[in-house]
């Protein structure tokens, strides 16, 4: 048997165990996908896996940044922004709107507050940002016991998944890969997420730009389709 270091062996075993994240796989489907990527030999498969890009790690989230959008996000906010019609009631600035009527806000980012039966949104999130900032300062500095939020590729918590720890953020999900060969990234892929004891904010653009969805603690969301946020998330901020 070939002798390799324990750390190297663990990394190889993690690569070989990737299918645990995606459920049952058919051999023919796997081989067909590999051929699509010009992988027909064991050597080519290993070379591809070794050269695969590494995912970006989440970075510590500074509560003070909650008070103002980063410059990159401000620039993105001036780009074309559209609001998909959710399949639930929506209230904007205290006024209930027909979901299809959200087009009147196209070109302007909205901040949504998630509820399983309705969405509440504001055009000016200054007060919301202040509340999040204050909550972060008053929170116990010890690590949260269930702080990680788990996000899934498909509805009903299916497919691949990844995590974002408490008080951490991913500013660009195009840099966070999934699958053993890292053929895909997590940008505009999230379709459901598990509950955590943290407040989590999801943004439609990278660098925390565009509209955002604030999900309160202990909120399981098995399906993002009704809210209009399915396959729409490009950055994540776990406020802890």
List each language-model region with its residue ranges.
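Compact beta-sheet-dominated domain cores in extracellular/mature segments
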Residues: 2-240
């Amino acid at each position: 048997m070939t002798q390799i270091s324990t750390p190297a062996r663990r990394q190889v075993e993690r690569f070989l165990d990737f299918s645990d994240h995606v459920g049952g796989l058919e051999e023919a489907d796997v081989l067909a996908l590999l051929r699509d990527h010009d992988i027909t030999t064991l050597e080519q498969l290993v070379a591809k896996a070794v050269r695969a890009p590494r995912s970006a790690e989440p970075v510590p989230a500074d509560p003070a940044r909650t008070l103002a959008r980063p410059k990159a996000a401000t620039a993105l906010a001036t780009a074309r922004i559209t609001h998909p019609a959710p399949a639930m009631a929506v209230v904007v600035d205290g006024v209930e709107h027909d979901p299809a009527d959200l087009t009147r806000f196209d070109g302007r980012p909205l901040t949504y507050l998630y509820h399983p039966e309705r969405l509440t949104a504001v055009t000016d999130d200054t007060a919301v940002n202040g509340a999040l900032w204050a909550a972060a300062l008053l929170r116990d500095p010890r690590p949260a016991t269930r702080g990680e939020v788990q996000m899934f590729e498909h509805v009903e918590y299916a497919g691949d998944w990844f995590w974002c720890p408490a008080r951490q953020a991913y500013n660009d999900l195009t840099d966070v890969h999934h699958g053993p060969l890292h053929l895909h990234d997590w940008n505009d892929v999230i379709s459901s997420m598990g509950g955590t004891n943290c407040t989590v904010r999801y943004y439609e653009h990278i660098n925390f730009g565009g509209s955002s969805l604030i999900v309160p603690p202990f909120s399981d969301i098995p399906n993002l389709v009704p809210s209009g946020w399915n396959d729409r998330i490009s950055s994540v901020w776990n406020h802890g």
